């Protein structure tokens, strides 16, 4: 983790963010590594990339669906902290400021699960 954070400190200020995937990628990394202020700022840019035409190309290129997919990944794998250990889904939530809870469903190894997060506590239940 220290190596990742050192690389972030060195290279994040140098990023041009000229790709529509840049903001979401940075949000995901920051959220997974506890950099919540930066995660929130990058998340908002990624979330509103098309709605506010942040890159100035939504009209020419249409919606940036890959960015929207990575926004979803930031919510689920970043803020909710969904990961898999010992053959089971686990949560390590750290929600952004202003967000008090989160619920979502997902499939893992052919089984359906529901994740419920309130504050810093989360549970994963198998849905039958």
Regions found by a protein language model. Give the residues of each.
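C-terminal beta-sandwich/jelly-roll accessory domains of carbohydrate-active enzymes
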Residues: 121-128
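Alpha-solenoid helical repeat scaffolds
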Residues: 8-12, 44
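C-terminal capping/lid segments that line or modulate ligand- or cofactor-binding pockets
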Residues: 1-2, 17-101, 105-108, 112-114, ...
